[in-house]
Amino acid sequence: MNKARKTYVLKLYVAGNTPNSVRALKTLKNILEQEFQGIYALKVIDVLKNPQLAEEDKILATPTLSKILPPPVRKIIGDLSDRERVLIGLDLLYEELTEEDWEAQSNL
């Protein structure tokens, strides 16, 4: 039987090609490739080029990372360098636990 794989849809709002924007994108791509390789879609939105998109999504600061799917929508504003903080903030940390993790926890 073919199991449907969950896809994570994220948007990263940045302001131009600033050091903060570049660092946020690089860090986020590293996290996504390590944890969700092949099961994510990331759209990078430059709010200087597309201010209407930022306004529609009520983005007030950059960088802002928004998880669109799966629900619920979650947002993280600012520094994305702390992997665990990003995963918890987006409500993704617990979904990465494997069966072995669950077994190890139940044996405690």
Swiss-Prot record:
Instruction: Extract the InterPro entries matched here.
Output: Circ_KaiB (IPR013474), KaiB-like (IPR039022), KaiB_domain (IPR011649), Thioredoxin-like_sf (IPR036249)
- GO BP term, pick one: circadian rhythm
Keyword Chaperone appears in the UniProt entry? no
Swiss-Prot/TrEMBL keywords? Biological rhythms
CDD domains xrefs: KaiB_like
Coiled-coil spans are: none
Database matches in Gene3D superfamilies: Glutaredoxin
Query: Pfam families, alphabetically?
Result: KaiB (PF07689)
Q: What does this protein do?
A: Key component of the KaiABC oscillator complex, which constitutes the main circadian regulator in cyanobacteria. Complex composition changes during the circadian cycle to control KaiC phosphorylation. KaiA stimulates KaiC autophosphorylation, while KaiB sequesters KaiA, leading to KaiC autodephosphorylation. Phospho-Ser-431 KaiC accumulation triggers binding of KaiB to form the KaiB(6):KaiC(6) complex, leading to changes in output regulators CikA and SasA. KaiB switches to a thioredoxin-like fold (KaiB(fs)) when bound to KaiC.
Q: Which family is this protein grouped under?
A: Belongs to the KaiB family.
Subunit structure, as described in the record: Homodimer, interacts with KaiC. The KaiABC complex composition changes during the circadian cycle to control KaiC phosphorylation. Complexes KaiC(6), KaiA(2-4):KaiC(6), KaiB(6):KaiC(6) and KaiC(6):KaiB(6):KaiA(12) are among the most important forms, many form cooperatively. Undergoes a major conformational rearrangment; in the free state forms homotetramers as a dimer of dimers. When bound to the CI domain of KaiC switches to a monomeric thioredoxin-fold (KaiB(fs)). KaiB(fs) binds CikA, leading it to dephosphorylate phospho-RpaA.
**Notes concerning its domains:** Has 2 forms, fold switches to a thioredoxin-like fold (KaiB(fs)) when bound to KaiC.
Q: What is this protein called?
A: Circadian clock oscillator protein KaiB
Task: Report the source organism.
Answer: Nostoc sp. (strain PCC 7120 / SAG 25.82 / UTEX 2576)
